[in-house]
Every structure is written in C-alpha cells, then in structure tokens.
Amino acid sequence: MTTANPFAQRSGLEYELPPFALIKEEHYLPAFYEGCTAQLAEVQAILDTPGAATFENTIVALETSGQYLMRMLLVFYNKSSSDTNDALDAIEEEMAPKLAAHQDAINLNPVLFKRIKDLYEARESIGLNSEDSWLLERYYKDLIHAGAHLTQAQRDRLKELNEELSKLETQFSKNILADTNDLAVLVETVEELDGLSENEIAAASSVANDRGHEGKWLIGMVNFTGNPVLDSLTNRELRKKIMEASLLKANRTNENDNKPVLLKMVKLRAERARLFGKETHAEHVIAVQTAQHPDNVHAMLRKIAPAAVRNAQAEADDLKKSAGTDIESWDWGFYTEKVRLEKYNIDTTKMRPYFELERVLHDGVFFAASKLFGITFKERPDLVTYHPEARAFEVNNEDGTKVGLFIADFYTRDSKRGGAWMNNLVDQNFLFKQLPVVVNNLNIPKPPAGKPTLLTYDEITTLFHEFGHAIHGFLSQVKYPRVSGTSVQRDFVEFPSQVNEMWILWPEVVENYARHHETNEKLPQEWIDNLNAARTFNEGHATTSYLAAATLDLAWHSLNSEEAAKVTDVEAFEAQAIKDYGLDFAPVPTRYRSTYFSHIFAGGYSSGYYGYIWSEVLDADTVDWFKENGGLKRENGEHFKNTLLGRGGSIDSMQMFRNFRGRDSKIEPLLKRRGLV
C-alpha cells in the first residue's frame, strides 16, 4: 500500500475533511483496489483470531475494518453525484460490480457468519450494554438479509446477481443524466418565455450560451415529471413541449433508453428474492423495514388513494373553470397558480423577492436549528471543498465546542444529478472520535453574476427538508459508525427531515427570513396567513402524483420470477399498475415514470418509495407534539435530540419514536394535514 494516495490515511485536517486539494481522479481506482485488499486482510485477521469469538474481537474489529476503502467511497460517490464527468463515469462503471463482489466476499463468508451467529445466540449472557447488543443484532440480521445463511450454490448465484445488478444500476443512472441533458428544450425567441421572471429568463439564456446556442434560451429538465417553469409560462404550446420532453426521459429507444435496463433489473431482483426464500423483492426488502410486510404498505396506501384522487378531481374542476377548457398535465401548474391567487391572494412570483437564498439559509434554516438545538453556524471559506460552489460552515454548540461541518452545494449544473439529497463525507462516531461532515445538494438554478438567488416556495421546502437530514447527521451521538446519524430504516429516515419543514411558516422563523432582498420589508402578514390557509390547496394533485409513483414501485417489485419474465411492455405495465389503484387520472401523471425513477432503480429505494408517506405519519404526529408543547423551544429540541435524533440507528426505530412521543404513532394527523378526512 502506498502512502502517496491521499485516501490511504486520515486527512489530519479539521473535522477530518477529505484533502480535496490533493485528490485527483487517478487516485480513486488505486485507493479502491488497495482499500478492498486491506479490508479483506483485516477480516481475515478476525477469522484467524484464536479462541472463541467475542464482541471486541469480532464486532468491534469489523467496525474498525475498511477505513481506507470507506474514505475513498464517501468522497467518490459524493463527487460522482454532484460533479461527474466521463472519467468518473468510467471509474464508477468499473468499480460498481467489483464493490458488490467485495461486499459479498465479506457478507457471505460462512466462517464470519458462524462467529457472529454464535455471539448473537449468546447475547444475553455476554454482558453487553444496550448499544452493543443492538449493534450485534444489526450485524446478525443484516448478514441474514444479505444471504449469509444460504447454501454455497445459492451464495455463488447471489454473488452473480449482485454484480450484474450493480452494473445495471450504474447504467440506469448514467442513461438518465445523458438523456436529461439532451432533452433540454431550446427556445428561439424571448417572447415565448412570457411569464418567467427576469432572473429565470437570464438563467435560461446563460445555459443556452454555455451549450453553444448563443442568442437563444434553454429550458433544462428536472429529475421528476414536469418542470417548475410550467407554473408561470403563459405559452401553452411551449408548456406542452416541456411536459412531453420530461415524460420521455430515458424512454426514446436510443442508446440512453432505460426500458431494457429496468426490465432486466426487475427479473434479477425477483430471482434474488427467491434465493432468500421470499416470493418477491418487495417482500424481502420490506421485511427489515418498520412496515415489515408489503401487505401493511398496500393497506395504508389503499386507505389514502381514493380520497386523494377525489380531491385531485375536485381541484381539476376548479382549474377548468379558471381556464375555460379541459385541463391537461402541462396546464395544471399554470392554472393552479391562477386559482391560488384567486382563492388565497397568493402570487408566488411576487413572493420570490422575499425569499433570497442567503437570508433563507442564515435567518431561516440556521436560525430555527439554533433556537431548537443551541447550535451556531459560521462559514469557513478557507476550507477547500470538492467544488467552488460547495461552501463549508462549521457547526458549534453555544459553548463553542465543535459539532461538525456542513457543506452546502445548492446550484444546479450539467454535471450534477437531479433532485436534492444529503450525504456524509465523515460519519459521526466515538469509536474513531470523529465529528460529522454532512453535505446537502440541491438543484437551484444559478442566477447571472451579480443577481440574487430568489427561491420558490418549493425550493424553500426542499432546503428545510434536506437540512432536516443534515441535523439528523449532526446531532448523532453514537459510538459506532454503522449506526451513525441517518443509518436507520428507509421508511423511517425521511421522518426527521419532514419534521424540519414545519418551521418554514412558524411565525418566529418566517418573519426572520422572509424579507424583501432590496428593501428589507417583511413578507406581508396577510400573505403568510394566506400561505397557512392554503396548506391543503393542491394536496389532491400532490398526493395522487406521489401515490402513483409509490404504487408503481411496489408493482414492479411485487412480481415473482415467472411474472417478471412475462413483462415486455414497460408503458403498458406502468399504466395498468396505476389503474389498479384507481390513480389513473390523466391530468395528474405519476411523479416519476419508470425510466427515470432513480430512487428505485439506482438510488437504494427499491420497494421503499412508500417510505415518504409512511414516515409522514410519524412526522405529522410529531408536528402536533411540538405545537402542543410550545413549538420552537430549546427544551423541545433537546427532547427530540436526546430521545431520537441523537440516537442514530443505535436502537429500534419505532422504540425511539415511542420514547419521544410517549406512545405509538397515529395516522389521523396525516389525514388531516393532506385534506383526506
């Protein structure tokens, strides 16, 4: 192993921030291969340890293994998501199947499994504290879930499946990015952009110039169905063109077509599930989530779907009255804004000057976190990050002790994948005495030089949401990296981030950040009242669109091997799956169509997209608790941190919720919030 590679040892920088000034593309693959070799040697040393397995010589030893590899992977996947290029794509393509094989070499090792199984069966008698006991249980159950208990022949086939699936996931993601960039809509005259703000028009011009279309305008695609510009563009033909382009992402029978990729993935996942003794991929995945079985998920979604569609149909009737014609999917956002203005006197374009990014970040997002948890934020421009637009902020407690580092990467670029997400560059843990380094990525259009970044209300929601994930990472106070921060079940992880959205319109918060960027005038109270009054406005559309995507995920992954083999027409399957739930309402397309549904075919959410609304049950109940207990108060934040946020994944998720709430969750607050009762 060479020490010339910057990943070979801890960086020694503040917060163990990776040494981005030293990291070059040629370092990734050597670090990957050397890191894999080093971890396999560390695991072999565990297996060669004389005498019986103990918690220290097996579980703690596993926790300390693989650090070289992990340092490289955390940096690489952050970079390849937020600032990729052809070289990084090629590295990921080479690395993905080999990483799957490396993980299988550890997870499917029968000798290692026996050591952990022996420990697990003796867990009551070996004097473990609660966190150690839970970690042991996590290791044992994760290995079972990974297939460690299978026969040799089954394990061999499992390795082949995992390797092939990792290649397909990488291809799926690559295809979307390429096709999304290619589908951007070129606009010839500025008159066609009527309705867009001056900043939006300037941004479209800048993008067009960057891509060689001087004197024209380019409307880029986003990761979900539709596009934010549809809310304000008056040109109906252009709206239609943008919507139709959006629906075609990775679905044009070209080299970026994801239909054959996802069909193969569905078949292989179904085959893999059967190896595990499960009939479907959904059954296998959900077994280790808080929902426990697909039937429980279906029951909840079917309870919500009819009311959501009824609300969407009623909303469409209102829009039709305003439009004077039948509403198509490309009309929905535009006439929604008109009706919102008529019903609630909410003009989102007039609000944007009050939502300047720096003000929202410092006086909204950071302000609320400071009030709740007593943490402070200070920008550190001296710290080198992975991209000039990625800004570092140190996070401290009120007494000056360090909490961690927050990296904010907010602007869209061609090299960044769509959507918004949180990830770690360093996981908090006491084992290595490491503080968290947390990244938030968004895709806010960058204004021309010298112009302010004025946010939409949806972008503010995304900013608060992703920072909720960041808080979950910051406030982690656990011993072991495996259970740090957001290392919880998929159908639980969205809950803390959703709770953080409650502070957007909290009086003390909104009056602090919603100021006109030129005059410093407060957002008029009448407008704030109207925003609160309109909370359930358009919820029929939002819920129906989301549920269609969630049911589509479940439909693909509820196929057994024989059923999966028979599916050849992706679009027909998609339409039938949505129709089976009664969600087939043409003006409201699914939030994601299959060919660009990255969450489930490239993002680790397969059979898990339901988790957003499953988590929202906990979120709505928690929001009620905050309101009942005085809202934005330090003692409330401390209770939330001590019982839940700070525990990471170190105890059972639902037990954490009970510790926080004092009881099991109730669905009624969610139904009320979404206007479903």
What are these regions (language model features)?
Residues 228-229, 293-294, 417, 448-452, ...:
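Short small-residue beta-strand/loop micro-motif enriched in glycine and branched aliphatics
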Residues 258-270, 437-440, 478, 647-649:
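Short, hydrophobic/aliphatic alpha-helical segments
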Residues 2-196, 626:
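N-terminal helix-rich structural modules
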Residues 12-27, 75-95, 119-160, 220-260, ...:
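Short His/Asp/Glu-rich catalytic/ion-coordination signatures at enzyme active sites or charged loops
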Residues 2-30, 34, 216, 344, ...:
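C-terminal, non-catalytic "cap/extension" segments appended to globular domains
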Residues 37, 41, 45-52, 68-82, ...:
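Intrinsically disordered or highly flexible coil/loop and linker segments, enriched in small
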